[in-house]
Amino acid sequence: LPAALGVKNGDVKMIKNAGGIISHPFGSVIRSLLVAIFELGVTDVMVVAHSDCGACHMSAEQMIEHMKARGIHQETIDMIRYCGVDFEKWLYGFGDTEKSVRETVDAITNHPLIPHDIQVHGFIIDSHTGELSRI
């Protein structure tokens, strides 16, 4: 990504996560954005997803099966569900990368703690060519 953007380390503040998805409006991604905006002076936000993303079509059910295969017990999963975690919402993927980027841009743009003067842009980077396409 830095090569596609023509930036070096330190030129930008990067927040990375699986799928480029904001899974909670007051989670760590938004917290990191708030720090970047209010403490580090960031004025522009770029949401960049990549083609062939591993989070595309991700299934909570399938991931839970992978967890169990790696030794996570059903009782642990049940206890976490009992504590209020909805695995289907928490571990969801997406089917349409462009739609997902638009939803993430919208979530940032309309967040009550993000100032209206912050510019938020969406992009998809081609995993094979590095080409960046604006959404």
Language-model features: where?
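Short, conserved "active-site rim" segments that organize catalytic pockets and cofactor/ligand binding
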Residues: 1-30
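Well-ordered alpha-helical segments embedded in enzymatic catalytic cores
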Residues: 31-35
